[in-house]
Swiss-Prot record:
Lineage: Bacteria, Pseudomonadati, Pseudomonadota, Gammaproteobacteria, Enterobacterales
Chemical reaction(s) catalysed: guanosine(2445) in 23S rRNA + S-adenosyl-L-methionine = N(2)-methylguanosine(2445) in 23S rRNA + S-adenosyl-L-homocysteine + H(+); guanosine(2069) in 23S rRNA + S-adenosyl-L-methionine = N(2)-methylguanosine(2069) in 23S rRNA + S-adenosyl-L-homocysteine + H(+)
Source organism of the structure: Escherichia coli O139:H28 (strain E24377A / ETEC)
Residue stretches in coiled coil: none
EC number annotated for this UniProt entry: 2.1.1.173, 2.1.1.264
Annotated protein name in UniProt: Ribosomal RNA large subunit methyltransferase K/L
Length: 702
């Protein structure tokens, strides 16, 4: 009897144990990452040929304590290697693990290689050559703390390499994991199986091989036992012949069918090739088709199973499309696949909840470093009384109501950018802004007292409902998460896409960037204030401080300002402002752009202006600014500096976002200034619910 070890992906150990026992293995013992078992020589070959779940089959040779590199050398050399190798066989060493002595795996592998070579030369036998790429024998050494475990890898290449997939092709899941997913899906061979996001077809091919009794090792060309001295070619040929006979019989007798589709024509072509090389191409129909076009291939029965490994995203900007995809799949399953089973394997359990289906079973597994879950569902047959479940119904109804109200209003106003929803319902704490045919959903980060999983699920529901109600393509929705700011955090960079969208606001053409920054380049709540500046600017010299992207300057220029001066500390935003001005034909010496710390520039400037717009941050302690700034504390000092630049009869429009801001009217009077609050006049319909989003004042000489 041989003592053997079969390795597998984490989470599949019990499944592998059952498989090995069915092959005839005895004394099976599950450990993390694999199964120890025993069997005769025939079982060695059968486990290699027939295991769909094992990553590798190892023949343990011994262990040794490693307190020095000499211990490792002597421990390896103690094994009778001349009885392991055939004469002339090549070998390679795979070494993993480190300890205080062996701190480099390459060094560990070199010591093992030296010990093996010296074992031959000391017996005056030809030394075996190393072949790292295609060795006849693979020696595996795993060092854990002070113990090194030494084994022969009888598999050669990993057993997931069945021989039907082009090695150049990238597969999101290995074939061994795919086989486990099929086994856990609840699908019964002899019933239809469909994968609507099949990629290169791995799940369907593994299922078809299982259903037709085709051994996973049947198409492999190389094995790790070819140079093993104890290899029995006669028994191996018997095992191989039996597998070929069973495969022919299984294919001839199988009557059901498999269906695969994917939106990528290139991977569908690869899937067809893979299925043909696996010997089951005639059983699978592959189509180039988007999930949105998915239909039941057997509407009159029989019932089957939909099985897939849908995409998941690591970046926030990929989530809206994935949420829409899962929501759509859930609706299609309910509408067209009543009576079928559904099984999905995913690295994002939250996305699976977008299906709006209740799972009957779930399993955990590792896909490389990723923690994954597989959930199985039964889709109930629809009845005349069945009503489709609404996702975030209260939110969807409010958004629909707001859309009806604001869409017509915005069209009449001549604006393309407006707020559709502003945390109207406390449990759906987001802002939804429309920018032409794009939508930005901003989630206000939930408090720590809210369960993170529930908050994420609610956000997914919001996105699915937003896409559905507004009828937009998922790739036209941008998702952002923001903390509630004490001031504008306009300089936070989120990305590097550099994609700008041209929008109209009254008679102005403006550029927005929906993805690269926390803000978009256009503060929607200041829309009316900008229009007022345009109406006030004819024939005047206009100054815009803390100008951001210069949208207020554009309105002033279009309103007939004699000159405009735009000041901001950020070169990025000044260049953006220049593009906005150029877009509206506002070029030349009359339109200056100045990069400077606005507070320092204000103290040193000696020019005169008729109309000044200033929208400072609530608070700033930027390293690039000379002093910390607090708008409540420092607004009088600011007004003192502004007054010096204000021409007789001129006006300052002063705005800020400080909640509860109190204007020091007495202090203003001492400066010879008076203030008129115009906040309510500057709040448009879409911001009527949020009356503290900004405050705005007109300041003139008393």
């Amino acid at each position: 009897m041989n003592s053997l070890f079969a390795s597998t992906a984490r989470g599949l150990e019990e499944l592998l144990k059952t498989e090995l026992e069915n092959l005839g293995a005895v004394e099976c013992q599950v450990v993390q990452g694999g199964v120890h078992f025993k069997g005769d020589t025939r079982l060695v070959y059968q486990s290699l040929m027939w295991s769909r779940l094992a990553s590798r089959i190892m023949l343990p040779l011994g262990e040794c304590k490693v307190y020095s590199d000499l211990d490792l050398y002597l421990g390896v050399q103690a094994i009778n290697w001349t009885e392991m190798f055939n004469p002339g066989a090549t070998f390679a060493v795979h070494f993993s693990g480190l300890n205080d002595t062996i701190r480099n795996s390459q060094y560990g592998a070199m010591k093992v290689k030296d010990a093996i070579v010296d074992a031959f030369t000391r017996k005056n036998l030809p030394r075996p050559n190393v072949d790292r790429d295609a060795p006849d024998i693979r020696v595996n050494v795993w060092l854990h703390k002070e113990t090194a475990s030494i084994a022969l890898d009888l598999s050669g290449d990993g057993l997931h390499l069945r021989g039907y997939r082009d090695r150049a092709g990238i597969a999101p899941i290995k074939e061994t994991l795919a086989a486990a997913i099929v086994m856990r899906s609840g699908w019964q061979p002899g019933t239809p199986l469909l994968d609507p996001m099949c990629g290169s077809g791995t799940l369907l091919i593994e299922a078809a091989m299982l259903a037709t009794d085709r051994a996973p090792g049947l198409h492999r060309g190389r094995w790790g036992f070819s140079g093993w001295a104890q290899h029995d070619e006669a028994i191996w040929q018997e095992v191989k012949a039996e597998a070929q006979t069973r495969a022919r019989k299984g294919l001839a007798e199988y009557s059901s069918h498999f269906y695969g589709s994917d939106s990528d024509a290139r991977v569908i072509q690869r899937a067809r090739t893979n299925a043909r090389l696996a010997g089951i191409g005639e059983l699978i129909t592959f189509e180039v088709k988007d999930v949105a076009q998915l239909t039941n291939p057997l509407p009159k029965g029989p019932y089957g199973t939909v099985l897939s490994n849908p995409p998941y995203g690591e970046r926030l900007d990929s989530e809206p499309a994935l949420i829409a995809l899962h929501s759509l799949l859930g609706r299609i399953m309910k509408n067209q696949f009543g009576g079928w089973n559904l099984s999905l394997f995913s690295a994002s359990p939250d996305l699976l909840s977008c299906l709006q289906l209740r799972a009957d079973k779930q399993y955990k597994a590792k896909n490389g470093p990723l923690d994954c879950v597989q959930k199985n569902y039964h889709v109930a047959e629809s009845t005349p009384d069945s009503k489709p479940a609404m996702v975030a119904e209260d939110y969807a109804n409010r958004l629909r109501k707001n859309l009806k109200k604001f869409e017509k209003w915005a069209r009449q106003e001549g604006i393309e950018c407006y707020r559709l929803y502003d945390a109207d319902l406390p449990e759906y704490n987001v802002a939804v802004d429309r920018y032409a045919d794009w939508v930005v959903v901003q989630e206000y980060a939930p408090p720590k007292t809210i369960d993170a999983h529930k908050a994420r699920q609610r956000l997914f529901d919001i996105i699915a409902a937003t896409i559905s109600v507004l009828g937009i393509a998922p790739n036209k929705l941008v998702l952002k998460t923001r903390e509630r700011q004490k001031g504008k955090n306009q300089y936070q960079k989120l990305g590097e896409k550099g994609e700008f969208l041209e929008v109209t606001e009254y008679n102005a053409h403006l550029l927005v960037n929906l993805t690269d920054y926390l803000d978009t380049g256009l503060f929607l709540d200041h829309r009316i204030a900008r229009r007022m500046l345009g109406q006030m600017s004819k024939g005047k010299d206009f100054l815009n401080l803390f100008s951001y992207t210069g949208s207020a300057t554009v309105h002033a220029g279009l309103g007939g300002a004699r000159s405009t001066t735009t000041v901001d500390m950020s070169r990025t935003y000044l260049e953006w402002a220049e593009r906005n001005l150029r877009l509206n034909g506002l070029t030349g010496r009359a339109h200056r752009l100045i990069q400077a710390d606005c507070l320092a520039w204000l103290r040193e400037a000696n020019e005169q202006f008729d109309l000044i717009f200033i929208d400072p941050p609530t608070f700033s302690n930027s390293k690039r600014m000379e002093d910390a700034f607090d708008v409540q504390r420092d607004h009088l000092a600011l007004m003192k500096d502004l007054k010096r630049l204000l021409r007789a009869g001129g006006t300052i429009m002063f705005s800020n976002n400080k909640r509860g801001f109190r204007m020091d009217l007495d202090g203003l009077a001492k400066l010879g200034l008076k203030a008129q609050e115009i906040t309510q006049k500057t709040l448009s319909q879409d911001f009527a619910r949020n009356r503290q989003i900004h405050n705005c004042w007109l300041i003139t000489a008393a």
